[in-house]
Swiss-Prot record:
PTM: Phosphorylated by STK3/MST2 and STK4/MST1.
Gene3D superfamilies cross-referenced by the UniProt entry: 1.20.5.110, Phosphatidylinositol 3-kinase Catalytic Subunit, Chain A, domain 1
Domain SARAH: 272-319
Assembly notes: Interacts directly with activated KRAS in a GTP-dependent manner. Interacts (via SARAH domain) with STK3/MST2 and STK4/MST1.
Purpose: Potential tumor suppressor. Acts as a KRAS-specific effector protein. May promote apoptosis and cell cycle arrest. Stabilizes STK3/MST2 by protecting it from proteasomal degradation.
Tissue: Widely expressed with highest levels in brain, placenta, peripheral blood and lung. Frequently down-regulated in lung tumor cell lines.
Species of the source: Homo sapiens (Human)
Gene name of the record: RASSF2
SMART domains: RA (SM00314)
Subcellular location field: Nucleus; Cytoplasm; Chromosome, Centromere, Kinetochore
Domain Ras-associating: 176-264
Protein name per UniProt: Ras association domain-containing protein 2
Length: 326
């Protein structure tokens, strides 16, 4: 396709556009830089709309801890066994057969406490495989399966251990439990999210927070393009972070996209950023030079307006001396 005469524009912010031709050139440079890596971007046209999609690297720049969800939304929570199941013997026996519940009303306590002389309790087992209660143990009101349930509760089975491991998730290679209430990612560590060029800054923020199950509101954070010079440019709510990354260039040694607290970071313009790297003595010398230049400009303006004031006064005197004509 010949793009030489193409005039279609791609939005890159509120009332800001870039030609598709220029964006394709930036995209080509971007993909050449990440050739053979999963950070390469793809583009397509959908209903005459030019869409770029792929992974966006975002660096953590948080100073305060973030709150993590106590439970995973996708986790299946098994309810604890009810009190009736602990005393009914409804679990599987040792041979895999289900034992029927032994109900308390069938045990005749009066016969156990006062048996007639010479009579003995039958020693044979009933059809359920359970022996009747003996004379000297009237207080045991549980079945053998109940004992098994209690014993297994004190030991973690391999399935329980696997379930506990599934509670854990990774942030930049470090595993944390969902039940951990707060966490602060290492400053400068990198993560990524899969987005497209139609997603605005708030949408990207929500996607990133949902990825790591962070409870904090997206309103607390902002995305910044941070340059090695110290310049910090906040992405507006109407900006498209993926487009901004493409236009900044692929090299993260020059600029990175940071997630930061909205109320903790101030934007730094290019004019200010070019002085950040200097030492204090050098900066003081700059201030002195600027002060001297300011003084020279002030004196120049004072001389200029002094001359103008004298000229105006001289003209007023000339008008006053001239007789009025009728």
């Amino acid at each position: 396709m010949d793009y030489s005469h193409q005039t279609s524009l791609v939005p890159c912010g509120q009332d800001k556009y870039i030609s598709k031709n220029e964006l394709l050139l930036h995209l080509k440079t971007y993909n050449l830089y990440y050739e053979g890596q999963n950070l390469q971007l793809r583009h397509r046209e959908e209903e005459d709309e030019f869409i770029v999609e792929g992974l966006l690297n975002i660096s953590w720049g948080l100073r305060r801890p973030i709150r993590l969800q106590m439970q995973d939304d996708n986790e299946r929570i098994r309810p604890p066994p009810s009190s009736s199941s602990w005393h009914s013997g409804c679990n599987l026996g040792a041979q895999g057969t289900t034992l029927k519940p032994l109900t308390v009303p069938k045990v005749q306590i009066s016969e156990v406490d006062a048996p007639p002389e010479g009579d003995q309790m039958p020693s044979s087992t009933d059809s359920r495989g359970l022996k009747p209660l003996q004379e000297d143990t009237p207080q045991l009101m549980r079945t053998r399966s109940d004992v098994g349930v209690r014993r297994r509760g004190n030991v973690r089975t391999p399935s329980d251990q696997r379930r506990i491991r599934r509670h854990r998730f990774s942030i930049n290679g470090h595993f944390y439990n969902h039940k951990t209430s707060v966490f602060t990612p290492a400053y400068g560590s990198v993560t990524n999210v899969r987005i497209n060029s139609t997603m605005t800054t708030p949408q990207v923020l929500k996607l990133l927070l949902n990825k790591f199950k962070i409870e904090n509101s997206a309103e607390e954070f902002a995305l910044y393009v941070v340059h090695t010079s110290g310049e910090k440019q906040k992405l507006k709510a109407t900006d498209y972070p993926l487009i901004a990354r493409i236009l900044q260039g692929p090299c993260e040694q020059i600029s990175k996209v940071f997630l930061m607290e909205k109320d903790q970071v101030e934007e730094v313009t290019y004019d200010v950023a070019q002085y950040i790297k200097f030492e204090m003595p050098v900066l003081k010398s700059f201030i002195q030079k600027l002060q001297e230049e300011e003084d020279r400009e002030v004196k120049k303006l004072m001389r200029k307006y002094t001359v103008l004031r004298l000229m105006i006064r001289q003209r007023l005197e000339e008008i006053a001396e001239t007789p009025a004509t009728i």
